[in-house]
UniProtKB/Swiss-Prot annotation:
Pfam families: Ribosomal_S19 (PF00203). The gene is rpsS. This is Small ribosomal subunit protein uS19. The keyword Transferase does not apply. The keyword Ribonucleoprotein applies.
Amino acid sequence: MGRSLKKGPFVDDHLMKKVEVQEASEKKQVIKTWSRRSTIFPNFIGLTIAVYDGRKHVPVYVTEDMVGHKLGEFAPTRTYKGHGADDKKTRR
């Protein structure tokens, strides 16, 4: 279920300030954030945002296709190690 259109998209204020400072500066640095709930805006394009996955910050390079999605969608929180191998040989 999506967010109501009358409310508009959500971005944490501290993240938006960091993005505005980054746009004003010449250097491109990685922006660290814990805000997985923030929506990606068009002015984020071309920036690298390190999104926290509960263990480490995952660098996410923002492209045009990502606009409108949440930052947390691009930093998975669970690592899938695969199912166990078939143990028929070891059971004998």
